[in-house]
Amino acid sequence: MTIRYPSGQQPPNVGRAEQPIVAPHSSSFAKRGMSLEKEINDANRYYLATEQAVIYKKPTPIQLVKVDYPKRSAAVVKEAYFKRPSTTDYNGVYQGYYVDFDAKETRGKLSFPLKNFHQHQVDHFRRCLAQGGVCFAFIRFTTLDLTYLLPASDLIAFWDQQGRGGRKSVPLTTIKDRGFRVKTGLTPVLDYLPALDQLIAANQAKGADHE
C-alpha cells in the first residue's frame, strides 16, 4: 500500500517494524540521533509496561484514495494520504488525570517559535483545560540539549498576545522560569513523569490559592 503526505511524499518510516526497547548503557550514548518523538514513545511504552501511566501517540488521520476489492470479504488499500492531525500528538491517563500534550523541537537557542503550533491545537488545549485536563507542550532546544514541559496555559497566553501584536516566540528564559525541566536517564532515556508530577503539583497549588 502506498501512503503519502499531502505534499505527495512518502513518510520515512512506513513499513518498518517497531523496534523493541533496549536499555541503554549511558544516557549520552542512547540519546545520540534519537528524535524527541522516539524518546517519548519509548518512555510511554516503558510507563505502560511498568503500570505507571497509559499514554499513547494519536494515530494520524488517513485519507483513502484508491481501494481494491479482490474479494468480497477483503479490501486492499492501494493509495492513501496522511491528513493533518486535528488535535495534539499524545493523550492518556496518569494517576487519575487526563493528560494531553504535543511535542516540538527547535534549533533556536534563545526562543521557541510559536509558528510551530497551529490554531486548532491551541483551541484543543483550551477545551481540555476547561474540562480539568493536564495539558502541556513538550519543547526541546536541540542545539542546547534542553527539554521542558511548558504548561498549556502559558503557551495559550503567548499565542493570544501574538494575535494582539505581541512577540511571535516564547523566550527560553520564560520557558525555564515557567516550565519544568525534563532530565535524561537510563530507562527510559527521557523520564518525563517527574516533571509532570511538578506540573500537577503546581496546578493543585494554583487551585488551592483560588479557593
Curated annotation (Swiss-Prot):
Subcellular location as annotated: Cytoplasm
Cofactor or coenzyme needed: Mg(2+)
Site keyed Transition state stabilizer: positions: K104
Pfam families assigned: RecU
Cellular component per GO, a single term: cytoplasm
Primary localization class, coarse: cytoplasm
Residues where Mg(2+) binds: T87, D89, D102, Q121
Key words of the record: Cytoplasm, DNA damage, DNA recombination, DNA repair, Endonuclease, Hydrolase, Magnesium, Metal-binding, Nuclease
Purpose: Endonuclease that resolves Holliday junction intermediates in genetic recombination. Cleaves mobile four-strand junctions by introducing symmetrical nicks in paired strands. Promotes annealing of linear ssDNA with homologous dsDNA. Required for DNA repair, homologous recombination and chromosome segregation.
Protein name: Holliday junction resolvase RecU
Species for this entry: Limosilactobacillus fermentum (strain NBRC 3956 / LMG 18251)
